[in-house]
Amino acid sequence: MWVPTLSSSSCSSDERDESSGEAALTPVYLNVYDLTPVNNYLYWFGIGIFHSGIEAHNLEYCYGAHEYPTSGVYEVEPRNCPGFIFRRSVLLGTTSMSRSDFRSYMEKLSRKYHGDTYHLIAKNCNHFTEEVCLQLTGKPIPGWINRLARVGSFCNCLLPESIQLTAVSALPERLEFSDEDESNSEASSVSDEEGSEQHLINVADREIVYLQNKPVRLTREEIP
């Protein structure tokens, strides 16, 4: 009886499909930053005051505070968030989400995380990264990242007021915002030469951006 066999070309095609499927899985990292040098001591006790950002496709997104009812989500250079001290990067898992889908997801999620709703205990940067991590990998972030917030929920006076008002609101010196906020560009001192599709907010030369500064928005860029 004649039994059909797969040709070498079809086999190689299947192998390419499998390899492309594997290549489509992108690592997801949690980039952890210190808010204070005290973390060098607290870290060994399983606690600390940490800021975190989520990284995939060489894009890192974070969540910070400001006083406006607009998104507090912003994009930074991976592992280099201004105003914070990078500590370590944690591999959380992988995602099959494409770069364009990842960016679209972050833009949609940014509407939920307004700068004026940031709360150090109930809705901070680590809550944001955990929601993203659950969506992308199905796993939560490590418990030690946000442990102090859980402890602080039982003791609101746990953290100094100075840390609450400054450290959690550090934002990058150049922040991007979306097309839909083009009407706000004049208020944020954006030059007309930068075009209508992408705008950058120039922040004063200092590491910490306080709550009275301009609102932050994501940018909608063309994906190659």
Curated annotation (Swiss-Prot):
Protease found in the keyword field: yes
Pfam hit, one: Peptidase_C97
Disulphide connectivity of cysteines: none
GO biological process: proteolysis
Active site per database record: H51, C125
GO molecular function terms attached to this record: peptidase activity
Keyword entries, A-Z: Hydrolase, Protease
Region of interest (Disordered), ranges: 176-201
Enzyme class: hydrolase
EC number(s) given by UniProt: 3.4.-.-
Annotated PPPDE domain residues: 26-163
Domain of life: Eukaryota
Tagged with keyword Electron transport: no
InterPro entries linked to this entry: PPPDE_dom, PPPDE_sf
PANTHER family: BNACNNG05060D PROTEIN, DESUMOYLATING ISOPEPTIDASE
Family, similarity comment: Belongs to the DeSI family.
Name this polypeptide is given: DeSI-like protein At4g17486
